[in-house]
Structure formats: structure tokens, C-alpha cells
Amino acid sequence: MAKINFYAEGVSLPRIRRRIVGKWIAEVCSRYGKAVGEISYLFCDDEYILKANQEFLDHDYYTDIITFDSCEADTVNGDLLISLDTVRSNARALDLRYEDELHRVIIHGILHLCGLKDKSKKDEAQMRAAEEEALVMLQETIGSELSLLHT
């Protein structure tokens, strides 16, 4: 049974429209022949994600998302840590709305759980294309002026 959880550590939990985000994630997973199992998002600050990156991945840098894959066969399961600090700073640097960048990061982790990679230039280009396709799906679902966040 599909279950998507949202938690926060050191930040306020974004006001996610849970039903819509759940439907969107399920649609994206379905495109890759996957079903949603249990997915947990932990929204955090830069310091929290840096410590997790150091402890679990032996990386000494900040990042917007860390994805821990617990997938089984064709069922998507995993834990995703998202630094809202980095999402916010990336949105400013890219001249994007915060909400749009958050949507991209939310689905980026799901795409990793569906098997996409982003370590090589070719893989990164495929990931970006998949993110864009997923964001179009989102816009078709909720309308171009709406957001996954409650305002």
C-alpha cells in the first residue's frame, strides 16, 4: 500500500498538498513501471544534510537532496532528505520560484528511486529531461498557476 510521509528537522515543514503530491509521485513511478511503496521525506537545513552526507556517504559538502534507496523489485521505497536552505539558495541562483525548485527536488529523488542516475554527463541530461517531463505532468495535474504548497 502506498504511503508517503513528510517530516521536518530544524525547519518548518512545507505545507505540502499531500493528496496531489502523492498522485503525482505515483504517476511518475508508473511511467517507469514502478508502484509506490513507502516513501519518507525529511525536510531539513543545510547543517543537517551536511552531517548526513558526511556520515552516510562520506561526502563533505552541502547538497539539496540525499536519496536512500530501499526499493524492492518494482516497488519504490526510500527515505529522502531535502535541505530547504539549499533549495532556496538554488532557486535564487537560477532565478526560479522557490516552489518550482522544491517540486524539482522532490521528484529528483523519486527519479533516483525509479533507477535514473546523474553521475555522468549523459545520465545528468537524461535526469534533467525526466525532471522536466515530471514537472509538465505536475502542471497538467494541478494547473500552471498552482503549487504543491498551500499558500
From Swiss-Prot:
Transmembrane segments: none annotated. GO terms for biological process: rRNA processing. Pfam families: YbeY. It is found in: Cytoplasm. Its main location: cytoplasm. It is an enzyme of class 3 (hydrolase). Single strand-specific metallo-endoribonuclease involved in late-stage 70S ribosome quality control and in maturation of the 3' terminus of the 16S rRNA. This is Endoribonuclease YbeY. It comes from Porphyromonas gingivalis (strain ATCC 33277 / DSM 20709 / CIP 103683 / JCM 12257 / NCTC 11834 / 2561). The lineage of its organism: Bacteria, Pseudomonadati, Bacteroidota, Bacteroidia, Bacteroidales. The gene is ybeY.
